[in-house]
């Protein structure tokens, strides 16, 4: 393979992955490296998007490159991979300490394009590349540049950042189910079962009583068994970030 062919090969993730064929690494790990722009050449690990050159796999250096604030290839990979951005918040000791027990906040930040790149207290947007000191989710959202693809990436429902700290009384209020209003319209046929039973039955199996409240949308719609299979709310299709079990009505 001549140099021109090799340069063409490393333009794609698959091509960079193929350059690592002789490396004694797990294929899944090789693919992750290739996604961030890394490839193997003359027994060295190089990057197509920055000047990174490694003579061997170094976990710390690989992590710094993966969540880089300077590499074009890593930034592009982060921009198209929310799970990768989310993982950055658990990849550094300082981020684990800062965002401990704040999984909902981390989800919201990752969804908005932000990731942690190793500088204590600071975040970077994978879309507009803005770097700033983190204060709150709302403040972070205002930092986006006007042409950023994540500028309007806001959930339909707002979540209190300190939701995990709500007391029992507040959680019971959030878990309350609103019964649909009764209409003064005479039905054309008698109901198959009492209205109270329809209101309290699970919207998935229509058998057991609903007892799990989804957050952040706050819909109480399914039973405990069915809730385990739900990734999105069956009422509004919002992504489920937390489940709260309630007492039978």
From Swiss-Prot:
Gene3D superfamilies listed in its UniProt record: Inhibitor Of Apoptosis Protein (2mihbC-IAP-1), Chain A, Zinc/RING finger domain, C3HC4 (zinc finger)
UniProt-recorded name of the protein: Probable apoptosis inhibitor 2
Taxonomic classification: Viruses, Viruses incertae sedis, Naldaviricetes, Lefavirales, Baculoviridae
Gene: IAP2
Species annotation: Autographa californica nuclear polyhedrosis virus
Function: Plays a role in the inhibition of host apoptosis.
Chain ranges of zinc fingers (RING-type): 202-237
Renumbered ranges of BIR repeats: 85-152
A Pfam family that the UniProt record links to this protein: BIR
A GO BP annotation: symbiont-mediated perturbation of host apoptosis
Keywords annotated in UniProt: Apoptosis, Host-virus interaction, Metal-binding, Modulation of host cell apoptosis by virus, Zinc, Zinc-finger
Chain residues that bind Zn(2+): 125, 128, 144, 148
GO molecular function: zinc ion binding
């Amino acid at each position: 393979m001549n140099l021109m062919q090799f340069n063409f090969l490393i333009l794609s993730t698959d091509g960079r992955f193929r350059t690592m064929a002789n490396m004694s690494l797990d294929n899944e790990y090789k693919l992750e490296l290739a996604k961030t722009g890394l490839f193997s050449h003359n027994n060295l690990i190089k990057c197509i998007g920055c000047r990174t050159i490694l003579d061997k796999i170094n976990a710390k250096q690989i992590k710094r490159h993966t969540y880089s604030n300077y590499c074009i290839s890593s930034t592009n990979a982060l921009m198209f991979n929310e799970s990768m951005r989310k993982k950055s918040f658990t990849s550094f000791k300082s981020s684990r300490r800062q965002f401990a027990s704040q999984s909902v906040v981390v989800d919201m930040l990752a969804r908005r394009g932000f990731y942690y790149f190793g500088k204590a207290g600071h975040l970077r947007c994978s879309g507009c590349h803005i770097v700033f000191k983190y204060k709150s989710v709302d403040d972070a959202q205002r930092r986006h540049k006007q042409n950023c693809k994540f500028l309007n990436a806001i959930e339909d429902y707002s979540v209190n950042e300190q939701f995990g700290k709500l007391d029992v009384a507040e959680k019971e209020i959030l878990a309350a189910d609103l019964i649909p209003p009764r209409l003064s319209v005479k039905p054309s046929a008698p109901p198959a079962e009492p209205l109270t039973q329809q209101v309290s039955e699970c919207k998935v199996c229509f058998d057991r009583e609903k007892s799990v409240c989804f957050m952040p949308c706050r819909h109480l719609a399914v039973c405990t068994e069915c809730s385990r299979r739900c990734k999105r709310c069956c009422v509004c299709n919002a992504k489920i970030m937390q489940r709260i079990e309630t007492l039978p009505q």
